[in-house]
Amino acid sequence: MTYLEALRTARVQSPQSYLYTTVARMHLGSVAAVCISILISSGRMTVKQLSSKAGIPVKTVKTTLVSLIQLRCVQYWREEGSGRVLYSFNEEGIWILLQSGEIINWIRCEYGEEEAEIIQNILEIGHIKVADYLTNFEDQKRHDREIILMRLYSDKWLRRLQPFNFNPLADIWEAKYEETIRSIPRTNTTSEIKRVTEAKEQTKRKIIDLFQSADDPNVVFTVKDGIKKLNPNITISFNLARFEKHLRSEALFHLAKYKVGTLTAKVYETALKLVEANSPDLNPQFLSISGWCADPEEVKSYKNSIENKLVDDRKITFGVRDVARALPEDLDLSCSILTHNFLKPTKRASDGANGAASKKVKLEDGESLDVFVENLEKNDSQSSSLILHHLKALCSGTNISFLHETSPSNFTIPYSALVDELKKHHYDLLIKITLGPNAFRVLRALKSLKLADEKALANAVLLKEKTLRNEIFNMVNLNIVEIQEVPRSADRAASKTFFLFRHKEQTAYNFLINSLTFGMAELLQGIVDFKDEHRILLAKCEREDVKGNEESLLLASELKTLKTLQEREMVSIARFSRLKALRQVFSA
């Protein structure tokens, strides 16, 4: 199978397959793209099966799979009886490749150049043993890198990698479940349903314990000369879930900025950063197991239980003082609107009045300075009071509760509820901007009515019948509105049938995710096609004698084509980033 054949197959199979195949082609080459396309379409396979289907030599396939496993794009599973090794696709590695530039830039801005260099090195090779990485440095430089690694691991940007991380989670579940169900004997007093339920619960506990063992502090850390360091024998990799939490925090900050204003949103951003590392994952990994949760309600309950446990353990709670300490120094809240609403103006004391209690502080040059302790305490209390009012506004200032107050002056962030509100907000804006205000009115009416016929909908939105039908037609084509047929007779005669309309959020979101994914793939494929079309010119520009001398060695037409290529690539990447950010919101 050639790359073009694999691309055509991926394009018609699913938007995700199209995107992943295109990304693999751009970053890893044609052979890797063909292997990934086949693994997505055919499921897990052996090396020989993959080689036969792809028409690629076994040796080349093995070499490619090693690289893909290293970069977490492929996982493997060894069967117990036959000993066969089966390979399957893992989308986590592709998403790391897609967001690697953004990840490095964020680490550079937040931490520094050396931290960004470490993350870049780990992203390039997938994972690395701590001892192997530190052998590249000597003495003080080595000590500095140990501190940086410890900091990045403590902030959860890095995670410990174990052998089971290379295995598909579904296969681990099946193996543990089979082991557990065999250990529970069949009895006359216990029903099969109860036996299976008990086996599932035990399997869940085993898998949770298995994954929690990766964070065992006795294994991960060592103490030398009173300094806590990472164990040099562990293997570390980048934690994609941590970056997804950062993206969620950014999205929530922008939503707060839109709803309550810039200054209050800045306070909220500080609060988000305080608990970001310990916040619940956007997509808990165990939910990918088919037997973990039975229905959507159970999934929702499971996510809420994770969040509630974090609140009970005080891992995602914070106080006013925590926010006050973490606020940026250049953020002046005294100019906010809340100042005049909640703080009384200070009375100007007369010159003859009794002054506030003062304290003598000795300076370096021997002179003393009167420090008015009472005034300092007043300023601190006023600052804390002002921050508290900003936090109160985030709790109940809008129709969205950005915070919940768990106890006086202590707050938590309701992530599950906020993610739902975030999706609704962005979806409503998309409908309003792309389809117009009339479609937005129809959508809001359907959300309110739940299920409505054309007449009830027309009365609710106050639109003409023809206009309403046009809007509904467009919205049905985009899976925003669903049609439900209601027959009035047993023979379901068309003349006696009427139709109801409804809006299902998850169905609409899934259609939007697929549309955004396909758009992302089309943009990347456009870049690839344009580069392939001018590959001779690009190869010429890569020559050592041409680099830096393009203007003197290239023709005017070639320079124009090169400029067009650069501009087109920049525009496509900018559009791609916007689509990716929007997809991230609805994928949570």
UniProtKB/Swiss-Prot annotation:
Recite the UniProt keywords alphabetically: DNA-directed RNA polymerase, Nucleus, Transcription, Zinc
Q: Which GO terms describe its cellular component?
A: RNA polymerase III complex
For this chain, the annotated S-S bridges are none
Q: Does the keyword Nucleus apply?
A: yes
> Cellular location of this protein?
Nucleus
Specify whether Translocase is a keyword of the entry. no
Region named Leucine-zipper: 516-537
Q: Which InterPro entries match?
A: POLR3C_WHD (IPR055207), RNA_pol_III_RPC82-rel_HTH (IPR013197), RNA_pol_III_Rpc82_C (IPR008806), RPC3 (IPR039748), WH-like_DNA-bd_sf (IPR036388), WH_DNA-bd_sf (IPR036390)
Pfam families per the record? HTH_9, POLR3C_WHD, RNA_pol_Rpc82, RPC3_helical
What is the role of this chain? DNA-dependent RNA polymerase catalyzes the transcription of DNA into RNA using the four ribonucleoside triphosphates as substrates. Specific core component of RNA polymerase III which synthesizes small RNAs, such as 5S rRNA and tRNAs.
* Family classification: Belongs to the RNA polymerase beta chain family.
Quote the PANTHER family the UniProt record gives. DNA-DIRECTED RNA POLYMERASE III SUBUNIT RPC3, RNA POLYMERASE III DNA DIRECTED -RELATED
Q: What is this protein called?
A: DNA-directed RNA polymerase III subunit RPC3
Q: Which species is this record about?
A: Meyerozyma guilliermondii (strain ATCC 6260 / CBS 566 / DSM 6381 / JCM 1539 / NBRC 10279 / NRRL Y-324)
